[in-house]
């Protein structure tokens, strides 16, 4: 008799837990502008470091490192840096526009 009583309580608890799971609202992960900007800067830095490492490997004569691969990596690095600079310029211009607005 006592076991049946416990089983009933367990079933009620499991049903309550299932209802709570179904009613739980999953919040999407919050994405902040600062976080995205920092991640983009990190990717630019990683690209530059990879290109620099590739160039150093080519300079010391590591087998399997071709000049065309080095040049492509250096161009990717340069383009990503230029893109980062342009984004910064647009952000500064937008900030200046907002600061020049009259209230």
UniProtKB/Swiss-Prot annotation:
Cellular component GO terms, alphabetical: bacterial-type flagellum basal body
InterPro entries documented for this protein: FliE
Location(s), subcellular: Bacterial flagellum basal body
Keywords of this entry: Bacterial flagellum
GO terms for MF: cytoskeletal motor activity; structural molecule activity
GO biological process assignments: bacterial-type flagellum-dependent cell motility
Family: Belongs to the FliE family.
Protein name: Flagellar hook-basal body complex protein FliE
Organism: Cronobacter sakazakii (strain ATCC BAA-894)
Gene (UniProt): fliE
């Amino acid at each position: 008799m006592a076991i049946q009583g416990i089983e009933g309580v367990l079933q009620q608890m499991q049903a309550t837990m299932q209802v709570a799971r179904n009613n739980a609202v999953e919040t999407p992960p919050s994405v902040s502008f600062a976080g995205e900007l920092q991640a983009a800067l990190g990717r630019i830095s990683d690209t530059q470091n990879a290109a620099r490492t590739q160039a150093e490997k080519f300079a010391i004569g590591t087998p399997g490192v071709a000049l065309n691969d080095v040049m492509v990596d250096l161009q990717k690095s340069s383009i990503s840096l230029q893109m980062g600079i342009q984004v910064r310029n647009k952000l500064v211009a937008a900030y200046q526009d907002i600061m020049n607005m009259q209230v």
